[in-house]
Amino acid sequence: MAGLGANSDVMVKLDDGHLNNSLRSPVQAGVYFRGHIKGGMRPGKKVLVMGIVDHNPKSFAISLTCGDSEDPPADVAIELKVVFTNQQVFRNSCISGESDEENLAFPYFPFVPDQPFRMEIFCQQPCFRVLVDGHHLFDFYHRIQTLSAIDSIKISGDLQITKLG
């Protein structure tokens, strides 16, 4: 099954344009998702992504960004890239077009083909705390200090999105 593709022309938006509703049915393969985080991030706020990994995945990515501009590209507060070929999770940010060095960031690899997952990204004062299926995966210290500017989410790759919150 093909995955959510970054080059896809199909856009999926929630009814009210905000990331505070469940999707009525899974977002099918071949879709690139962009959504708005109502009010932006702040300490104590959580972003929930539930999905099912495709049958034969290569990778998927989840990014929290400052807007959804493509030109110039929006600042990326945190990008999580899950790569199945070598079972790695990378984390990164990109501010004013300058990417940090990608950090390999996991004590274990929690993603399994054809299986559901629940990822929670908690915004805390010094960092994002990322949990998968209730287990701590890593902390990522903020590179963007104005947390409320982090108001968009992008998801692409080899997965189906079943719920956002």
Swiss-Prot record:
Pfam families: Gal-bind_lectin. Residues 32-161 form the Galectin domain. The keyword Secreted does not apply. Keywords: Lectin. Gene3D superfamilies: 2.60.120.200. The keyword NAD does not apply. InterPro entries: ConA-like_dom_sf, Galectin-like, Galectin_CRD. GO terms for molecular function: carbohydrate binding. Monomer. PANTHER family: GALECTIN, GALECTIN-RELATED PROTEIN. Does not bind lactose, and may not bind carbohydrates. This is Galectin-like protein 2. It comes from Mus musculus. The lineage of its organism: Eukaryota, Metazoa, Chordata, Craniata, Vertebrata. The gene is Lgalsl2.
